[in-house]
């Protein structure tokens, strides 16, 4: 009995002939592991299935959060799901319920705020951020999001107010640095200087004084930099001195070639700092003393090394245009114009091997940078003009062109006060290789010169070249509208909508309608809608037509000039809008366009809920359809189910017809006698 107790004894304790490692065991376990089950993809055939699915999911989520209210992940998953369903009010309600449970959850606040920002609900996001920083003022992430949002919206004054609220809590260094960067971005250097003063009082560490000094070095004067370093040394005292502060101070003086001042700073620091705290200071002082040699010689060595590197790369691939860009920038920093020209000339000599535009895209920028350098840096205007000319000769315009080259050449001529040459360049471009971008650039040039007659001519040529471009017609009409020539604008719109090959005709129609509505020509707008409805029965056109009728003011309202006061919709406007809805409903009913009919009824119901009486609302509600499941036979004798709409009005008409047929049948059976 005793021998059976405990683990069996190992008789042979020698190592096994085949050793198995833990890695091998793990690999075999993973290889033999069965794949995890994946949930099948759900697809919804209709709204009824979707609503059923949504109700089921909501019940599941409510069960989760009811069982474990303190688990914020359940709440956030619930709210995220509602956001995916575009149910923003439900999502807000869920977030607020979660905040009632745990108002200090940073992750929950962030999710809530980001959901509002993502959906561009700015005021909601602002209110949430205000609540968050009030409840949790020590959480920097809320403040960062707050100031980022305000600055993104262009509310700089509001951003400053948020920063000031934040600074009253004396946050860490990152917050102060963010405030300073804000003022630097908007060139408010005095404000930034005042913030640095408060910053160094709250956080007097040496690195912060160095930041202030570098700020003054970049935006202030050398005297201000010295004043900052002096204040830092005086404030820190000998107990809190740091070698980094003195190194930065000395490097600043050396940068200004004040070598004696720098040497004095090094000696002052070495005399007062212990050896254990001044190792880097000793090294910096040694390097400083070695820097009295020829600095130009050192720079030449560095430049020569990089030149050799670039030359080796270009030997491997002479058409590596990125290397040519870097090589040219290197020579530009060296300041030798002859070397720069030599590199650019060698670079532009590497013409792409094929006449495919994708091979020329990078190459063409070599010409652009070369011409700009000659004009701006070398001040050689004639050579820059020659570069533009040679580049335009080189491009195979019959196969492709680069509008940017033509436009840059024209802009160069304008900078040289040669307007005729600029016009000649752009005219030549349009004649050789017309492109929409060229037309736009030429028209913008003439518009800036207030040459509106030339603008008209260019628009006419563009439309003649490409009449299918909807934007050309719209821009042309907008030009005439800006010149207060409504008749010409109207004529252009008329020509535009008559074009059979427009790429986006709906944009031209919309612009024409908006133009007439802006001009107050409401009868013309109605005529346009009627003409458009002759071409299409799109439900959006009908809905927009009805909305237009709602917004049309009466004659008495047009005479009064009280634009600030919002007026109620008149009964006549409601009548006109209902007439449009009724016409549309009749059309869709006759053509059996059920989807469009449902969308129209939804818009009609929204209109009645906003402007109608309870009787009108009841009337439209009675017309709303219901979804039913039907079956239909396929070609292979199988049946499939589909969802269809059943309209109450159609059911009533069918019922009435059935009653008439039944009465006729009874009359026939009774031999012509009327049976009640």
Curated annotation (Swiss-Prot):
The gene is clf1. SMART domains: HAT. GO terms for cellular component: post-mRNA release spliceosomal complex; Prp19 complex; U2-type catalytic step 2 spliceosome. InterPro entries: HAT, HAT_Syf1-like_N, HAT_Syf1_CNRKL1_C, Syf1-like, TPR-like_helical_dom_sf, TPR_rpt. Belongs to the crooked-neck family. HAT repeats lie at residues 52-84, 86-118, 120-152, 154-185, 187-218, 220-255, 257-291, 301-333, 335-369, 379-415, 417-448, 450-482, 484-518, 520-551, 572-610. It is found in: Nucleus. Associated with the spliceosome. Its main location: nucleus. GO terms for biological process: mRNA splicing, via spliceosome; spliceosomal complex assembly. Residues 554-573 are annotated as: Disordered. Involved in pre-mRNA splicing and cell cycle progression. Required for the spliceosome assembly and initiation of the DNA replication. Pfam families: HAT_Syf1_CNRKL1_C (PF23231), HAT_Syf1_CNRKL1_N (PF23233). Gene3D superfamilies: Tetratricopeptide repeat domain. Keywords: mRNA processing, mRNA splicing, Nucleus, Repeat, Spliceosome. Residues 554-566 have a biased composition (Acidic residues). This is Pre-mRNA-splicing factor clf1.
């Amino acid at each position: 009995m005793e021998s059976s107790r405990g683990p069996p004894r190992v008789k042979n304790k020698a190592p096994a002939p085949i050793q198995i490692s833990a890695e091998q065991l793990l690999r075999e376990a993973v290889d033999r592991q069965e794949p995890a089950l994946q949930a099948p993809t759900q697809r919804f055939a209709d709204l009824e299935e979707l609503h059923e699915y949504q109700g089921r999911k909501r019940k599941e989520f409510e069960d989760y959060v009811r069982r474990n209210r303190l688990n914020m992940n359940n709440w956030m998953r619930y709210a995220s799901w509602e956001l995916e369903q575009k149910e923003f009010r439900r999502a807000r309600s869920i977030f607020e319920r979660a905040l009632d449970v745990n108002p200090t959850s940073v992750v929950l606040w962030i999710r809530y705020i980001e959901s509002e920002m993502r959906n561009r609900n700015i005021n909601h996001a602002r209110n949430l951020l205000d609540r968050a920083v009030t409840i949790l003022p020590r959480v920097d992430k809320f403040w960062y999001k707050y100031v980022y949002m305000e600055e993104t919206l262009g509310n700089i004054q509001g951003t400053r107010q948020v920063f000031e609220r934040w600074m009253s809590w004396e946050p860490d260094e990152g917050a102060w640095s963010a405030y300073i960067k804000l003022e630097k971005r908007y060139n408010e250097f005095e404000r930034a200087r005042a913030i640095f003063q408060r910053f160094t009082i709250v956080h007097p560490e040496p690195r912060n004084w160095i930041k202030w000094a570098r700020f003054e070095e970049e935006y202030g004067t050398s005297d201000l930099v010295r004043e900052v370093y002096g204040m830092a040394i005086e404030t820190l005292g000998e107990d809190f001195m740091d070698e980094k502060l003195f190194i930065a101070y000395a490097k600043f003086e050396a940068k200004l070639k004040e070598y004696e001042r720098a040497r004095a700073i090094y000696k002052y620091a070495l005399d007062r700092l212990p050896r254990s705290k001044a190792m880097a200071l000793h090294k910096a002082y040694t390097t400083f003393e070695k820097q009295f040699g020829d600095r130009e010689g050192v720079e030449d060595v560095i430049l020569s090394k990089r030149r050799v590197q670039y030359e080796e790369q270009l030997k491997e691939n002479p058409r590596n245009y990125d290397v040519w860009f870097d090589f040219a920038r290197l020579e530009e920093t060296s300041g030798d114009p002859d070397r720069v020209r030599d590199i650019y000339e060698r670079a532009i000599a590497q013409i792409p091997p094929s006449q495919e535009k994708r091979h020329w895209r990078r190459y063409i920028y070599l010409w652009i940078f070369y011409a700009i350098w000659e004009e701006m840096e070398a001040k050689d205007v004639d050579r820059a003009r020659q570069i533009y000319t040679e580049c335009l000769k080189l491009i195979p315009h019959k196969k492709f062109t680069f509008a940017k080259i033509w436009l840059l050449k024209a802009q160069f001529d304008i900078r040289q006060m040669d307007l005729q040459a600029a016009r000649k360049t752009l005219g030549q471009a349009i004649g050789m290789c017309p492109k929409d971008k060229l037309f736009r650039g030429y028209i913008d040039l003439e518009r800036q010169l207030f040459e509106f007659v030339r603008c008209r001519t260019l628009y006419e040529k563009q439309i003649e070249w490409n009449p299918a471009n909807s934007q050309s017609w719209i821009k042309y009409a907008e030009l005439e509208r800006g010149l207060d020539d409504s008749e010409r604008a109207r004529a252009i719109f008329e020509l535009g909508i008559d074009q059979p090959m427009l790429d986006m005709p709906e944009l031209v129609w919309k612009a024409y309608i908006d133009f007439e509505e802006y001009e107050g020509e409401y009868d013309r707008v109605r005529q346009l809608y009627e003409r458009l409805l002759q071409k299409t029965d799109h439900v959006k056109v009908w809905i927009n037509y009805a909305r237009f009728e709602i917004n049309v003011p009466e004659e008495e309202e047009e005479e009064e000039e009280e634009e600030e006061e919002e007026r109620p919709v008149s009964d006549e406007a409601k009548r006109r809008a209902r007439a449009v809805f009724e016409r549309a409903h009749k059309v869709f009913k006759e053509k059996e366009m059920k989807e469009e009919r449902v969308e129209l009824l939804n818009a009609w119901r929204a209109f009645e809920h906003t402007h109608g009486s309870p009787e009108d609302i009841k009337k439209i509600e009675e017309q709303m359809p219901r979804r039913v499941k039907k079956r239909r036979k396929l070609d292979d004798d199988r049946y499939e189910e589909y969802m269809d709409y059943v309209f109450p009005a159609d059911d009533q008409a069918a019922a009435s017809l059935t009653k008439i047929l039944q009465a006729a049948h009874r009359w026939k059976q009774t031999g012509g006698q009327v049976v009640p």
